[in-house]
Amino acid sequence: MKSELDSCRVEPALEVLVGRWKLSILYFLFHGTKRFSELQKGIPSITKKMLTSQLRELEEQHIIRRVVYPVVPPKVEYSMTEYGKTLEPILELMHKWGSDHVKYMQLNRNSQVTNNVME
């Protein structure tokens, strides 16, 4: 007999998206093809090792495409696959929810401070 967790399809989605930097990487790639150095500049806190690791995982999941050009110096570009582009509406909703959540928390933090002062 299947448990409710067995039928939960959120888990496979989270396996693809969870990673400290994956959502930031996807955000930049939804705005166009990027080179490694462009991604690193866009996410200054990420190390080269971590960026490489996160890019590899996304590539293995067919979310992004890595293209190596046979030139000197080496040129590598990353872009969204057609399959990866199906995540865009989900990420847009997550972005909106995150923005709303920040505003909500700020409002509630301010009212909490006001309540504490009045006590």
Name each model-derived stretch:
Residues 66:
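Short beta-strand "wing" residues that participate in macromolecule-binding interfaces
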Residues 8-50, 70, 74-77:
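N-terminal helix-turn-helix DNA-binding core of bacterial DNA-binding proteins
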Residues 54:
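Residues within the DNA-recognition helix of helix-turn-helix
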Residues 27, 85-119:
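Amphipathic alpha-helical dimerization/coiled-coil segments
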Residues 1-20, 93-94, 98-102:
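N-terminal amphipathic alpha-helix
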Residues 62:
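Glycine-centered, phosphate/nucleic-acid-interacting loop/turn motifs that mediate DNA/RNA or nucleotide
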Residues 57:
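Alpha-helical DNA-recognition elements
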Residues 70-93:
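Basic, amphipathic "hinge/linker" alpha-helix immediately C-terminal to the N-terminal HTH DNA-binding motif
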